[in-house]
Amino acid sequence: MVVAAATGDPLRKSRTLRTENMDELSKNDVVKLLQENQGRMAIPGGLLMARGKKDYVGGMPALSGTLFFKDAHTPAVRDAICACFKEYQAVAGQYLTWLWREEPKDGKVCLAYCDAPPMPDMMKKLGEGDAVSFGYTSGKQSVDAGEWEFQAFGIRGWKAKMGTWGLSSVRFSMPLLYVEEHPLAFQTMFVKFADLLKAVHGYGGHALVLSLVRRTDNEPVEALMAEQMNGLDVGEPIQNAKGAGAGIKTVSWLTAINNELLEKVGGITALRSELPRDWFAAYPYSDGVVIQAGPYAEFATVNSDPLPARYILPNMFLKDVRTPHIGSLHSASKYGEARIRGAAADKWLARFDVPPEELLSFKAKLLDEPKLTKETTLPERL
């Protein structure tokens, strides 16, 4: 695989160990592997582009959570976004280095994190007709991708009132090593954010965190990796905002769904029936539930297990509330490089679909997949 070679063999190795030989590895082995190879996971900027600057970090593997919600133009929801960042800041603040803003009311578009005003102060200066736009990263250079990242995007009030512009979003990421060392941190934060934002839906799992301001030049790497890993998130929330208004984008290790959407597929009773609690946990939040699929996130690599039952079963359960069409996950190609657009994007949405007659075989397959453990499950489950 080209990307693995470019980012160092340890990325390929860690993926293979996690998906194929997890039973043979102790937790300490996984942590040691990530510790020894942290610096080799960075993907050079513009790696698959014919032209463009290459002297920066274009992407970093991480766990990423995305939540879609309504009414980001209102004071209450803007306060909720600030509360989310406060939670994130308590964990990631020491690693953050840069803040990017779109159309700031005052100051520069890019600020060193140490010089940035508190988010509530910046938020208060925004009017209802202003877009919410904050992007915090841990990259060494301002254009570098970082394993720690927090993005908040809120559509303008007039767009929100039209009801045709989709949903706003918050996206956060954590390094793979941090999640291994703190096995409940990602789930805790994801559920907390869903609760604060009254999320309509969302997902959390493996992702490639791309440069905040040079995303377009690094999408081809994401496209190539997505061909090899079904468990990898693709596309940015801002680009997917309209599609998010029509239904969920995908399932992942964590999947948030509000009560309105859940009722359309049979409610909590159907969830408990279709997703056995030995493998799936349901955590309540203010407006719905978060479903955890197994003890850890799956890459679902094509050369090991592209169709894990822990992802197939929730996908089929929630398929009827999935957005039917997303348009494009990537921007247009510049020089003929690979992108996930149009029919390819719709195919990606359906990557975990299986014929209904095969569901029974995946329920049988689930019996051989890792179960939840006390160490990997939050206590506040239904």
Describe these PLM feature segments.
Residues 2-6:
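Compositionally biased low-complexity segments, especially N-terminal hydrophobic helices
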Residues 21-96, 215-382:
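C-terminal interaction module
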